[in-house]
Amino acid sequence: MKLRNLLLTCLLLVSAGVSADAFEEPVFSCIRDMTPVRGFYIDNLLGDLEATKAVAESEEGGTYPPGSVIQLVPTEVMVKREKGFSPDTNDWEFFELNVSEQGSEISTRGFEDVVNRFGGNCLDCHEKADPQWDMVCEQNHGCDPIPLSALMVRAIQKTDPRCEAVPLSDEEMAALQALSGGAGE
């Protein structure tokens, strides 16, 4: 009977197009290898990038499909899990990463209790998004503003240590210096 239940579970996962392995040990690499959309990056762990992109680019919002990956900065990731997995987070799992030239290491992952390196609880911010945006924050989605300008975000994205180096503009360099507390002289 146990074998039968195991086989049924495997069959259900395969028929639903959900790969449990994709969620168990997700691999997060260079943010710029993902698909850019209005200043953030998207992907899909299950290969359904077109469905993820359709929601991300929609002017009306929508519900992201399972496997959707969203990143604004290299060290923070949201992954959409299968429907019903975590109703309190709208099925989003939050990740805090340590990134280096060698790759990514998951520092923290979870649902309601993930706190980023600046002390902010991921869910506390994302749950403020208007319902049609499926907990994804942008400037006009209902979330509290983050203390980073678009220029700062772009500079942070360009300096992801997992990526091939790209030149920074003088403005981007000044933005990074301002972030690190430098005078920008």
At which residue positions do the language-model features occur?
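Sec-dependent N-terminal signal peptides
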Residues: 5-14
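N-terminal signal peptide c-region/cleavage motif recognized by signal peptidases
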Residues: 15-19
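Sequence context surrounding c-type heme c attachment/ligation sites in exported
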Residues: 21-39, 61-185
